[in-house]
């Protein structure tokens, strides 16, 4: 399959790209222009055979339609402005990320994708003093959590309107190579 991936150099993104390539898929990794983390996608110092790197701002994902000749099957949207701790409370940055995600859905349709997969966050649920699962009521406690939940609701609706399958991967505490030393797992 041909898979477009935003957020490809993020902690989760690098692992996802590696796994997709290992499974024989062609990956179109969308990176910020002059990304300082582009080398995370290299294998043995080289760009893997089935990997195409495309530099594009998250706010301009529609430009991919004119830049890509290949038909794409899946759009994996992990890119997000303001995912870092200092920006999670900035409602303006978070709203821009919501609009980026909805434009990513439209771009996915224009590229011929059948599926759109978005990575959500435990922040959608807010704080609960009980065991959590997908049935628990969402009560986000930050602009970041509110924005991720807004994308889940609006992108799913937009995908239905555009006849795209929608997938929502709500990510809770991940860990592994390259994890931040201040992450939940690393500090336990």
Protein language model features and the residues they cover:
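N-terminal Rossmann NAD(P)H-binding glycine-rich loop of SDR-like oxidoreductase domains
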Residues: 3-23
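Conserved catalytic-core motifs of eukaryotic protein kinase domains, centered on the activation segment
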Residues: 40, 85-92, 127-131, 180
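NAD(P)H-binding glycine-rich loop region in Rossmannoid oxidoreductase-like domains
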Residues: 52-96
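Conserved cofactor-binding/catalytic machinery of classical short-chain dehydrogenase/reductase
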Residues: 60, 74, 100-103, 115, ...
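Conserved Rossmann-fold NAD(P)-dependent oxidoreductase catalytic core, especially the SDR/UDP-sugar
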Residues: 77, 81, 102-143
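Active-site helix of classical SDR
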Residues: 147
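NAD(P)-dependent short-chain dehydrogenase/reductase
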Residues: 153-188
């Amino acid at each position: 399959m041909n898979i477009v991936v935003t957020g490809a150099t993020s902690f989760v993104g690098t692992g996802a790209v590696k796994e997709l390539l290992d499974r024989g898929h062609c990956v179109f990794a969308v990176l910020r222009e002059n990304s300082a983390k582009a080398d995370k996608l290299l294998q043995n110092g080289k760009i893997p055979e089935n990997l195409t790197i495309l530099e594009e701002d998250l706010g301009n994902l529609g430009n991919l339609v004119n830049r890509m000749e290949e038909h794409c099957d899946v759009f994996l949207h992990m890119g997000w402005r303001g995912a870092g701790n200092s920006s999670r409370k900035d409602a303006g940055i978070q709203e821009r990320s919501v609009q980026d995600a909805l434009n990513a859905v439209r771009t996915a349709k224009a590229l011929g994708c059948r599926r759109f997969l978005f990575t959500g966050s435990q922040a959608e649920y807010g704080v609960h003093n009980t065991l959590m699962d997908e049935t628990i009521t969402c009560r986000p406690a930050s602009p970041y959590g509110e924005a991720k939940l807004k994308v889940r609701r609006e992108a799913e609706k937009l995908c239905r309107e555009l006849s795209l399958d929608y997938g929502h991967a709500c990510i809770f505490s991940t860990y592994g190579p390259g994890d931040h030393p201040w992450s939940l797992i690393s500090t336990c």
